[in-house]
Amino acid sequence: MPILQPKLMKQLMKFAIFGNTYQPKKSLHALRLFELLKKQGAEICMCREFYQFLTADLKMEVPVDALLEGNDFTADMVISIGGDGTFLKAARRVGRKQIPILGINTGRLGFLADVSPEEMEVTFEEIQAGRYSVEERSVLQLICNDRNLQESPYALNEIAVLKRDSSSMISIRTAINGAYLNTYQADGLVIATPTGSTAYSLSVGGPIIVPHSNTIAITPVAPHSLNVRPIVIRDDWEITLDVESRSHNFLVAIDGSSETCKETTQLTIRRADYSIKVVKRFNHIFFDTLRSKMMWGADGRR
């Protein structure tokens, strides 16, 4: 695991804030966040959807300097306040900008958004002092042979191919760098980064992969054969998928955003040519987070 050096930032920073719009009670943490940032003299920008949710729906007074429209914005750091889903949406908006993203967890599990509301004050003191780390997380790219996707073709967590409009399984012919691997008879197939290995991939039996492992996990969803198991490959290898379905279509989900493809569509999945920068507290250790979130060693008898 690489040793990450602290990043020294200027005293006055510009923060771009993204949040979810369906947790009214937990949105009170946003007020504390604004208070901390203004105390540091920071410039606050906010996505318009979150701003309207706080001001129009919750009647909050929000001290913002500018509203963000679309994906055309600049900032020293992006703050995602919500769960991992909110973090993924923020990462999609950041795209290739290489702006580091800090996740404040007001959701449930939170592997990406792992700073608790109780840790906000000390975390921003550390950021002000330059005592934090930035981790580079790999991204997957999806290419279709016959169409352009309506959503972004990039995934920080995973790309999933799933059945649609039928209870019958789909058939997914899978090749790695042109070499035939297997034809999966299953409800779907999940292609995950190390970051995504603790998300959907884990729930369907995929392996937990340490960040910076430079790998991709391929895990079937409810396979027909008990002999089929997940496989981990290098992330500089290319995956090609050809799908057959009784409904003649299938679903592609990219970090939770989905759309329908025809079974004539061939999918190519490869590592993207950019990464997402994730802000972590300087004393952050992945294994501590893993042990805590997965409750390893917890004894319910006590």
UniProtKB/Swiss-Prot annotation:
Molecular function per GO: ATP binding; metal ion binding; NAD binding; NAD+ kinase activity
EC category: transferase
Cofactor(s) demanded: a divalent metal cation
List of residues binding NAD(+): 84-85, 89, 157-158, 187, 198-203, 222
Catalytic activity: NAD(+) + ATP = ADP + NADP(+) + H(+)
GO biological process entries: NAD metabolic process; NADP biosynthetic process
Localization, UniProt: Cytoplasm
EC number: 2.7.1.23
Matches recorded under InterPro entries: ATP-NAD_kinase_N, ATP-NAD_kinase_PpnK-typ_C, NAD/diacylglycerol_kinase_sf, NADK
Similarity comment: family membership: Belongs to the NAD kinase family.
NCBIfam families xref list: PRK01911.1
Listed name of the protein: NAD kinase
